[in-house]
Amino acid sequence: MTLTFQAVQVANGHDEEGRLVFAEGRLIGVLVQLSGLHEEQGVAGQWFLETGYGRGLSGEHPTFPDLSAAEEWIRQRLER
């Protein structure tokens, strides 16, 4: 399965760096890099699944230390 990540700017006021996630050309999720406002929670700079679409991703909102970890988690979910 081919996953692609497209860089985008997200207009939510603070966590602006984002990635659209596509599987075989279909949008399956939106990842947002958490800003310094999340330092107290210990997740600043990590990637957050803002929204996911389809089986295994809908309703999930985990954080990941980097995009590689996010990709691995998404692949595992899609292969279920």
Model-derived features with residue positions:
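Intrinsically disordered/low-complexity terminal segments and short unstructured peptides
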Residues: M1-L3, E50, P62
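Intrinsically disordered, low-complexity regions of eukaryotic proteins
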Residues: E17-R19, G52, P62
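A generic structural signal for ordered secondary structure
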Residues: L27, E60-P62
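Short aromatic-glycine-(Arg/Gly/Cys) micro-motifs in beta-strand/loop hairpins
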Residues: L31-G59, Q76-R77
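A short, charged, amphipathic alpha-helix used as a generic interaction element across diverse proteins
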Residues: Y53-G54, T63-R80
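Negatively charged, low-complexity tracts enriched in Asp/Glu with abundant Ser/Thr
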Residues: M1-R26
